[in-house]
């Protein structure tokens, strides 16, 4: 079989104007970036506001493993399959960050015959959204440091500045730095650092805003520092929100591309799935449910992180109601959760599969708590045996959940027809969607509800500083915000080594942070890396461009 790059480079793309026309976007609502990429003007929302809503489908997964689950590939393949069975479908994905592209991943546009194209463009700069996020974020940092230098009228405590700078590359040496060295002319010296751009609160705010004015209001609420008296200092106090919003005036418009089979795809925004909510923009999702019969989107990591945040944060701010969930798993990944080492995953092991199946069952139970019907997509690998497949099917049947073998990586949309048909049936059951908690509950109650109900924790322990800050946030009027828990993605617990379905464990909340602009309180249950480093052999070393313009090494 061809490599992903070879498949993508041989794709027969249609002009993006034709893709847009097929889903009812008018020529004057498109802003073209060449022949195969476009932004969509938000003016379209006024024209289509009275159109009926299509079905909203969330693709999520079991707890991630090194064996791979194939969530993005499934999302794309499912969109293609829905179109094959006569349903008008659109897929929505997050846009890739350059850091992982040149670091370990080498690209993030699906795989096999379920990819979005033009692959090279999407992975490299795309339409400049992440650069706009970077610039808006760093403008705020520059205005704050200038305020310190010019007399510090707001009495900012330079030891309590929480706004760092960002860049869209993996750079470990920038995690902790000292600014302002070289004398008074160079500003006020202080410790700071850089995060990767997609970890920026600007990105999270972009993806939760409903329009540009909403985004500007969110920017004004961003807390950058605290005064000597302990008062929050915001971007609004620094008069930064207007300039930041101006920099984002194009970035807030969704990007339209296509899959290998010419299914329309929105790729817009890409916040972290741990310290933020890990889903593409609300703007793109709301547009998709108006233009399509089926809007298929995904959320980062496993259902304990991505799906929980999609339901409790994204659906709340976007006024969205999910109609069904596709839970992606593979027999290899389930065996990993049953304790099998990576080099043994190709061997039949029903005992380990049974243990690992508990992880899938827990995620299914969690989805049911939100009242949304689910279908399991079992990504096929050549090493899967008929006994193992039968076991997964029987266990899903016992939970009254449909399961389908997904072959979209090898066959494209054709390999997802059974999944698409079962999904359509699931959406017809009717969603009884509900939130897990109410916003008027205390912040600690919200955190503990997620830890107990979704993760399966027995108790939650707070560091003294975390307790103090939660109380401070509630006293400052932020108690009604949803919570966003940052923890390892590899386990249902906060300990990456606890695979399968651990129970009765204690979750340790070490720190809490306020993302007032994005609109949530982050509870950190573990060390979260917000600026990755490059590995021993970065993907960048194998990426090149030939004299004829052919790009090699992006995979």
Curated annotation (Swiss-Prot):
Its EC number is 6.3.4.3. The keyword ATP-binding applies. It catalyses: (6S)-5,6,7,8-tetrahydrofolate + formate + ATP = (6R)-10-formyltetrahydrofolate + ADP + phosphate. ATP binds at residues 65-72. Pathway: One-carbon metabolism; tetrahydrofolate interconversion. HAMAP family: FTHFS (MF_01543). Belongs to the formate--tetrahydrofolate ligase family. This is Formate--tetrahydrofolate ligase. It comes from Syntrophomonas wolfei subsp. wolfei (strain DSM 2245B / Goettingen).
